[in-house]
């Protein structure tokens, strides 16, 4: 598999974990987050700093085109929207998909109903809430 350029919006638990795994797998990874201290979460998963390990970090709001451009969205093979807000994730995922023609766009959506609708619109949605519902139901109803 050829190395991909992966852009991740949001350096929280999900975004930073995916970023670290992708970097370890040999991909080029760029993370954008509005909190300048959020790169500390990226650093803690590395033996060195995130940047020394080969990752890039951009401070900026992913809803701002200039910040997305600075983070490298124009050359992204994959875009992951993993900020705290469903609305933000859905908007930036559509920007990545429609304006920048990113080949693979993955968006985290807490609301299962919205996740299903956006999946029908062509976005690759992940709903942690739906996953928890499915697992809890399975555990509760299994004999």
Model regions and ranges:
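Cytosolic regulatory regions of ion transport systems
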Residues: 1-143
């Amino acid at each position: 598999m050829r190395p991909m350029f992966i852009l991740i919006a949001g350096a929280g638990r999900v975004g930073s974990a995916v970023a670290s795994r992708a970097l370890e797998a040999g991909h080029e990874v760029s993370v954008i987050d509005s909190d300048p201290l959020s790169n500390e979460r990226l650093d803690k998963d590395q033996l060195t700093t995130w940047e020394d390990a080969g990752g890039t970090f951009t401070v900026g709001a992913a809803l701002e085109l200039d910040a997305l451009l600075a983070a490298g969205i124009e050359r992204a093979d994959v875009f992951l929207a993993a900020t705290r807000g469903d609305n933000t994730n859905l908007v930036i995922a559509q920007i990545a998909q429609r304006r920048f023609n990113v080949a693979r766009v993955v968006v985290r959506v807490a609301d299962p109903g919205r996740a299903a609708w956006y999946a029908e619109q062509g976005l690759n949605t992940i709903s942690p809430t739906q996953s928890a519902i499915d697992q809890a139901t399975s555990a509760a109803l299994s004999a």
